[in-house]
Amino acid sequence: MTQILVKNAFSWVNIAEDVCKFIPNCKLTVIDKEAIPSVEDTNVIYIGDLMNVKTISMLERIKAKNVVLWVDETRVPKTSYSLKNLKYNYWIVPVSQWNKEVYEEHIGHTEEIIPRCTEFRRTEGKRRGNVLFGVVSFTPGVYKRYEELLLAVDYYRKNYGELEIYAYGHTEGLPSFPGVHNMGRLGKSEIQKLYSIADFAIELGIEAFGMPSIEAWAMQVPMLYGNVNDVRNHAYGVSIDPVDFDAIDFGEYILPVPIYDEYKLAEKIREVAEIEEVPELPEKYRCSYTAKKLISYLEA
């Protein structure tokens, strides 16, 4: 049996569920931050972040023969950690080039990059109605863009035509605005339904390490995305520079945010919405492919 351990984070649990479907005799265990899971299986795949004392302590205490660590970091770690006490064979598999560089700086050798994955697939033709529909995934990093986005939506309506926005994710506390629908936190199937009616998607996060760009591409929806970190490598659509990335002080997590001009942002929305054809998602972003790659380490 292969046991998958996954941190209790919404996007990673969704991914782990899809990966487990393609691994024979697979058992999925969702773990809390403080938990030391019971592991009796020979092979373990751990999914989540790694640069954390509690996480590494947990990994050191489980009993297994072979462990694959499919991991990411959303911030540069402040402290170096070591996995030297692990008593089993392990492979560190980063999800992106940025993650690979971070782990190799702090831990050492890593394996080839295996990006995040999805099994979303478009089953309906792209909609083209009189009203343009956009989907926005909200994370804390996007809050800084909310007012600018609303101004751009208002500008678009006055100059180009009707536009409706559906926002999901961390939308708690966001002010109401005509034609902007805050959907809150949605399940996997509900997110897929949103993308099935969307003409375009927006991801303007400063950190931008999440799943929306891959999910939108899988649903063949073009995206307006922030040109930062690794999102530029797995998004299809139109990019916009959201921040002077060299000016970010990660030590204090200071994120200087220049102001978007509503005209510029509205023009970018218009540009991405005019993309009619989006190619199918490359195989390397499919969880069926990911499962084969991860299990290959355990079978070597």
Curated annotation (Swiss-Prot):
A molecular function GO annotation: glycosyltransferase activity
Origin: domain of life: Viruses
This protein's record includes keyword Transport: no
Enzyme Commission no: 2.4.-.-
Family statement: Belongs to the glycosyltransferase group 1 family. Glycosyltransferase 4 subfamily.
Organism expressing this protein natively: Acidianus filamentous virus 1 (isolate United States/Yellowstone) (AFV-1)
Keywords, in A-Z order: Glycosyltransferase, Transferase
Source lineage: Viruses, Adnaviria, Zilligvirae, Taleaviricota, Tokiviricetes
Protein name per its UniProtKB record: Putative glycosyltransferase ORF300
Presence of keyword RNA-binding: no
